[in-house]
């Protein structure tokens, strides 16, 4: 991001370093050291600083770190050699309408398995939602709401963002599940809501039946930032 006074800043790179380390452990990949990750962020941003969108544009420089196996392995087993790479690109609003409220449908497809890899930032989790998001767009929806795969009664997340709900008494509620990706944006928003805005916050199981009783709903994530939901 570019700040009002012209500085270039990154959003919580330390927590992103911790999350990629956790994901590596879950996928049997050697952990990317935090110092290496943070150095890469600084070098990539510095090399592409001319592409950081100006303050007030609503756009950002999106940074994508990734790790993948590179040696030839036929069997179902971890690779022996991996590469850690990082690239960046300027991006505008995640949804085409910008801050315009989006429309979401409840999906009949599962994004992740119970006690599986849903809490790991792995490419396979996004692959699981590709056909479903294309189908949603073809039917006039912006995103899918995924329910828990075990009982299909509780709200989890979308294919690329976490949910935030606000009750009629002003409490900020976010779903809790072991198959939801731990969102750094969501975590930060909950701290801001509680510590700086004085709001009551709850991270708990959210049943789909109670969604109709919330006063507000939104999505949050690295790309989505904060996107209002107008209809489910």
Each model region followed by its residue ranges:
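Conserved alpha/beta cores of soluble small-molecule-handling proteins
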Residues: 1-144, 150-154, 191-232
